[in-house]
Amino acid sequence: MALNKLKNIPSLTNSSHSSINGIASNAANSKPSGADTDDIDENDESGQSILLNIISQLKPGCDLSRITLPTFILEKKSMLERITNQLQFPDVLLEAHSNKDGLQRFVKVVAWYLAGWHIGPRAVKKPLNPILGEHFTAYWDLPNKQQAFYIAEQTSHHPPESAYFYMIPESNIRVDGVVVPKSKFLGNSSAAMMEGLTVLQFLDIKDANGKPEKYTLSQPNVYARGILFGKMRIELGDHMVIMGPKYQVDIEFKTKGFISGTYDAIEGTIKDYDGKEYYQISGKWNDIMYIKDLREKSSKKTVLFDTHQHFPLAPKVRPLEEQGEYESRRLWKKVTDALAVRDHEVATEEKFQIENRQRELAKKRAEDGVEFHSKLFRRAEPGEDLDYYIYKHIPEGTDKHEEQIRSILETAPILPGQTFTEKFSIPAYKKHGIQKN
């Protein structure tokens, strides 16, 4: 479903839409030798000394969202783009959708949602915090000749909240979600307490009430260990809950204890809502995950998902020259270019310029009594699961794929060659209201 879908899409040319310089060590500023800098652990003794100087002034449990951290721990992508890590195994999602058995469909949904957590930098890096109004779009050309589309926007800055939409129209699959990371300092660790939620719908499969089959999926918390002393590493911890029409699972992401235990282990049991147990989930979220049928005493565990045998399908993004100034890759380009060559002095200065401009805009809005309104996502209405949803009405019906694709592409430029329409800058709530009237 490629670019010929653009023929009748209305479009106009896009008209536009205290610093820490010098903190990085000479080692951190040295040029890379072919390696991806996201995979280089730059938090050596010098880096830990810098972090210690910053964090020694904090109390355990305090909010880190307003603390400026050194750029050597930053990944070269925004959180809005990093969310797509969870969407890079569409083959597993398509398998789930095509399964006719409700229990096996749930099992495949669990496998799909677990599949993406291992994708990320090899070193401990955090994504760039999106600025208010920042947006990111992407698409996938799938092996089955269909396309998937993704739209995300930063709808709140304090607290940070990212809203996103993903759809494979021709397979009747839709995903909506919000990511709400609340950062805390925990001594030798920092934590991102993930309070967001994902909602997956199979639009052509109806539940007992005649509505699209729906799954709600929470997120494990993310811990950066060893930020002051010892070796830094990422751990996922606590619980991830997946709830479907008939089945549910609470998967515990186990964190290693001081004396015993192992890293990266998961454990959970798939049950129905009467408490009957069906399957046990085990293994490691960044290695091999297993499933065992609890209904058969002689059952042995089998592979649910092997991260070494499945390869992620990365999203495609429009060329930089076609992007608006608030699109993630264009917005952060000078920062990510500097990070790519480990020039942390330039990265810090460029990041400061972007964030300082946002502070000035926020101050001006406060002085003028003007409220910020997102352009792509509208606030939820009573009874909805999430805080925000894409403003655009996506036509319902399994025979309306052409109209669905058109609606998605009218929301924001996604495919190469698309340009911004005059309506783009109108607040989402107004565009949503016009649709309803």
UniProtKB/Swiss-Prot annotation:
Give the Polar residues compositional bias ranges.
23-32
Q: Where in the cell is it found?
A: Cytoplasm; Cell membrane; Endoplasmic reticulum membrane
Q: Which residues bind a 1,2-diacyl-sn-glycero-3-phospho-(1D-myo-inositol 4-phosphate)?
A: 64-69, 126-129, 157-158, 351, 355, 359
Molecular function in Gene Ontology: lipid binding; phosphatidylinositol-4-phosphate binding; phosphatidylserine binding; phospholipid transporter activity; sterol binding; sterol transfer activity
Task: Show the cross-link location (Glycyl lysine isopeptide (Lys-Gly) (interchain with G-Cter in ubiquitin)).
Answer: K276
Q: Note down the stretches annotated as region Disordered.
A: 23-42
Chief place of localization? cytoplasm
Instruction: Report the GO terms under cellular component.
Output: cortical endoplasmic reticulum; cytoplasm; cytosol; endoplasmic reticulum membrane; membrane; plasma membrane
Transport listed as a keyword: yes
Per UniProt, the keywords (alphabetical) are:
Cell membrane, Cytoplasm, Endoplasmic reticulum, Isopeptide bond, Lipid transport, Lipid-binding, Membrane, Transport, Ubl conjugation
Q: Which Gene3D superfamilies match?
A: 1.10.287.2720, 2.40.160.120, 3.30.70.3490
The entry's a 1,2-diacyl-sn-glycero-3-phospho-L-serine-binding residues are L64, S65, R66, I67, T68, L69, N129, S183
GO BP: any one term: piecemeal microautophagy of the nucleus
Q: What more is known?
A: Present with 2350 molecules/cell in log phase SD medium.
Q: What is known of its domains?
A: The OSBP-related domain (ORD) mediates binding of sterols and phospholipids. It displays an incomplete beta-barrel containing a central hydrophobic tunnel that can accommodate a single lipid molecule with a flexible lid covering the tunnel entrance. The ORD can bind two membranes simultaneously. It has at least two membrane-binding surfaces; one near the mouth of the lipid-binding pocket and a distal site that can bind a second membrane.
The task this protein performs is described as: ipid transport protein (LTP) involved in non-vesicular transfer of lipids between membranes. Functions in phosphoinositide-coupled directional transport of various lipids by carrying the lipid molecule in a hydrophobic pocket and transferring it between membranes through the cytosol. Involved in maintenance of intracellular sterol distribution and homeostasis. Involved in lipid countertransport between the endoplasmic reticulum and the plasma membrane.
Q: What is this protein called?
A: Oxysterol-binding protein homolog 7
Please tell me the species this chain comes from: Saccharomyces cerevisiae (strain ATCC 204508 / S288c)
